[in-house]
């Protein structure tokens, strides 16, 4: 298996959502927020408006939990 092949954007987005989900399950909203912001930056860089909207919605939800 060639380790030098870059990960596809779909796999990168999926990995970020799974990683954030682990933090959300543990109620570690600050860590989840950091991961969602990483996903937001990736979506901006790739000009993926659909994923950008998803990450931004999750960011809003995390920020609400942090304010509670």
What role is predicted for each listed range?
Residues 58-68:
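Alpha-helical linker/edge segments of TPR/alpha-solenoid repeat scaffolds
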Residues 1, 40-41, 47-48:
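Amphipathic alpha-helical segments of tetratricopeptide repeats
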